[in-house]
Amino acid sequence: MKLQWIKLIGLILGLMAGAIIVPYFIPSIDLHLTERLQSPSLTYLFGTDWLGRDVFLRSVQALACSVRVGLSSALFTGLFALFLAVLGNSSHGLYQTVRWAIDTFLALPHILLLILLTLCFGSDANAIIWAVTLSHWPRLTQLLLQEMKTIGRSRYVLHAEQFGSSRFMALCKHGFPYISAQWVIGLILLFPHILMHIAALTFLGFGLEPSQPTLGGMLSESNRYLMLGYWWLGLLPGVLLILIVLILAKAGRAMTQQVTHYAND
């Protein structure tokens, strides 16, 4: 169990470090119009695009951007969901209000809501982070709300209230240690979901400026050239997106099984 957690934490820290450090080591991606649409070679591992830019360097830069935005979005979403779970269990009225908000947001078309929020916040990384946070919180909040409700009935929370602590503070102090594993796993499972939605947003032309390389944007731009035989334009961005999503999804499932096994024992 401990080894699995160490591996997982190492994976997350590695992604964070890579997303922050890698862009500083990528040389400036200049236009080389004389080398447009070059096929993969030793000079250009994954070829060049219609403006002569190195597809490999752009893909690495796009992946780093997606990981940075995705990690920030997942963290803010998790913190917001945790806050609502604690707040919702502070009183019966707040519980019903949070439940109503969850049901309302889950009833809305997910991608459409994400697009509308992105349009409201603008075209930069912060806009995507806010849009993702305000559209992806319901399911994690739903899980944490029920877990916190069970903890709220425990003796130590009731005793803390009897000794003068507010219910909100009692749940913060005694509840989080018991749901921390579920919270972390929820974030890990949410991360690939967020990455896919960020890619979908940028594929449709929302979110970041066109000058910022993104995996979804590169896939969208490659559409017009794929039918002409320039297959490499969409290969690497697509492979990188699929790989990172599969790795994170597998890590999340593995940790879920470990926690379930540990709880049953």
Model regions: which residues?
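N-terminal signal-anchor/first transmembrane alpha helix
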Residues: 1-30, 179, 242, 246
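Transmembrane-helix boundary motif in ABC transporter permease subunits
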Residues: 22-25, 66-103, 114-115
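Generic hydrophobic transmembrane alpha-helix motif, especially the helices
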Residues: 45, 49, 89, 95-150
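Short helix-to-coil transition segments within interhelical loops
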Residues: 48-53, 91, 159-178, 219
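Transmembrane alpha-helices
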Residues: 64-80, 168-200
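Membrane-cytosol interface at the C-terminal ends of specific transmembrane alpha-helices
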Residues: 74, 123-172, 182-191
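Non-cytoplasmic
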Residues: 115, 124, 129, 133, ...
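C-terminal transmembrane helix and the adjacent membrane-cytosol boundary/short C-terminal tail
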Residues: 135, 181, 188-189, 230-265
